[in-house]
Design a protein with these regions (language model features):
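Short, flexible loop/hinge motifs at secondary-structure junctions
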Residues: 1-173, 216, 245-246, 252, ...
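Catalytic center-proximal scaffold of phosphoryl-transfer enzymes
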Residues: 6, 90, 96, 114-116, ...
Length: 516
């Protein structure tokens, strides 16, 4: 009998373990399902809800009002713990229109009855105007440009022949359209995300001229070819610095294998805060992409901890750093899956205090030295608190749950997350790199895919120039109009002088209005 009881107890214990495992598995699967639904249907906000804030009322050392205010501001904004409360400024009133815009007078005359004095019956005199301004627009106006090259000859010396003015350098020789039309087409596609089929339809509607998408695509590819050497020079500029932020995003590339499928390629983005950004097209997300681009780079490389950026990338003195926004986002995702996850809410609140330190430095217009001193004063005790909290979390949450994965991710890259203590130029987040990816994300929903693998490097060069001009406040149309004809007709060896940064440096009074 005792043997039977022991066997039954052993079987019961085994079934209990199986049941516990099944429950944990169900919990993880439910969490993943909820995560998919949130990604598909839920809001993109990373703020905390009222219910989540109520849970913090019982949490020691957590002030609900501070969390509410900081959550609404988002990462990077100062919190009451790190900056004085600022009073809301009065509303500035109606926005004034920029002085650089031309003014066109529109005179509104008085009615005939107002032109006669009601007292004596005499004619009144204009003594001034009541002036108001509104922003107006003139739709794109197409016209035909007649280029007349002067021909000269000596009537006395007919044997000397005729001399004609030289041809004007153009992006595409003998093209039906001017350089301005080609540049406008490119900017509309890659800055305004208007696909070529839509531009072709608009052109036909407004002018009656039908230019096929294939012809427009040829213009784009020609410009891409011309800009590849410029993008290469931009890469050299970037590698000569000591700080690069990197990220990557997928793009579909049309295949021509007869199956009608697309291949998922990647645009890798490399940039520096306050400077240019360079895109590199690769057919895969493998390590060979950053290994080739960052060959022999010596400096700080800030990424999201994707493994492809690690082994064999850069020079021997490369310093790897990671992004606090990525770590924070994982805890925010955990809160979205479990709105009563007090531990994850607390982790988000602590990270917001960390971002508030740098926000205070920005508000006070501190240089790197000032920010470094502020970080050294306020960040170390806060980092100890964050790490201790996450270590305690990791002991109580399921390893495969969102909170467990957020904890594991943050602890695994902790050394890289805290590099900012030693390098004052290092930003807390990689958000600037992510922001440079937004035009591609917007464009994907409009132009769908890249036409071929050969087109990839050309598109990457175009994105490099367009996005760098945006980041550097350079009017991209003026820039392209200045460099493309010369590149097309007399390719220069000194392409380093044609990068957006170098071009703008020679124009210190360059207007930063009308950038596109």
């Amino acid at each position: 009998m005792a043997e039977v009881i022991a066997q039954l107890e052993k079987q019961l214990e085994s079934e209990r373990k199986e049941l516990a495992y099944a429950r944990l598995k169900i919990q993880v699967l439910e969490e993943r399902l909820r995560q998919q639904r949130i990604a598909q249907y839920g809001p993109g906000s990373e703020t905390l809800s009222n219910l989540q804030l109520e849970l913090l009322d019982e949490e020691p050392a957590v002030n609900r009002d501070e969390v509410q205010a900081q959550s609404e501001r988002g990462p990077g904004a100062p919190s009451p713990a790190t900056s004085e409360k600022k009073h809301r400024a009065p509303h500035p009133g109606r926005q004034s229109l920029p002085a650089h815009l031309p003014r066109v007078d529109k005179v509104v005359a008085c009615a005939p009855s107002q032109c006669v004095c009601t007292c004596c019956g005499g004619e009144t005199t204009v003594i001034g105007y009541e002036i108001s301004e509104v922003l107006d627009v003139k739709p794109a106006e197409y016209f035909v440009e007649l280029t007349k090259r002067e021909k000269r000859a000596c009537k006395k010396c007919e044997e000397q022949g005729v001399a004609a003015a030289p041809l004007t350098a153009r992006i595409i020789d003998k093209s039906l359209v001017s350089d301005r039309v080609i540049i406008d087409t490119l900017v509309r596609k890659y800055a305004d995300h208007c696909p070529l089929y839509r531009q072709s339809s608009i052109l036909k509607r407004d002018t009656g001229i039908e230019i096929s998408r294939g012809t427009m695509c040829g213009w784009i590819m020609r410009v891409g070819d011309l800009l590849i050497p410029v993008a290469s020079a931009m890469r050299s500029e970037l590698l000569a610095g000591n700080y690069i932020q990197a990220d990557e995003t997928p793009v579909d590339v049309q295949t021509h294998d007869g199956r009608g499928t697309n291949h998922q390629a990647y645009l890798w983005q490399y940039g520096t805060p306050g400077g240019a950004t360079v895109f590199n097209f690769r057919m895969s997300r493998g390590r060979e992409g950053p290994a080739h681009f960052l060959d022999r780079f010596e400096g700080i490389l800030q990424t999201d901890a994707y493994a492809a950026y690690d082994r064999g990338v850069g020079g021997v003195n490369i310093v790897h750093a990671c992004c606090w926004a990525h770590a924070r986002r994982r805890f925010v995702d955990a809160v979205k899956l479990n709105k009563r996850d007090v531990a994850s809410i607390r982790a988000v609140e602590l990270m917001d205090e960390l971002f508030a330190i740098d926000a205070q430095a920005r508000d006070d217009n501190m240089d790197h030295a000032g920010r470094h001193a502020l970080r050294q004063q306020k960040a170390p005790p806060l980092l100890d608190q964050i790490r201790g909290h996450i270590l305690e979390m990791s002991k109580t949450v399921l390893p495969k749950s969102a909170a467990g994965q957020a904890s594991s991710y943050t602890l695994a890259i902790w050394t890289r997350l805290t590099r900012f203590l030693d390098y004052p130029e290092l930003e807390l987040s990689n958000n600037l790199a992510e922001n440079s990816m937004r035009p591609i994300a917007l464009g994907r929903s409009n132009w769908i895919h890249i036409g071929s693998e050969d087109a990839g490097p050309r598109i990457a060069a175009i994105f490099s120039v367009v996005e760098s001009c945006r980041r550097l406040n350079i009017p991209v149309r003026d820039y392209l109009a200045a460099i493309l004809p010369g590149l097309a007709n007399a390719p220069l060896q000194r392409t380093a002088e044609l990068t957006p940064a170098a071009w703008a440096a020679r124009r210190p009074h360059l207007s930063t209005v009308g950038l596109l």
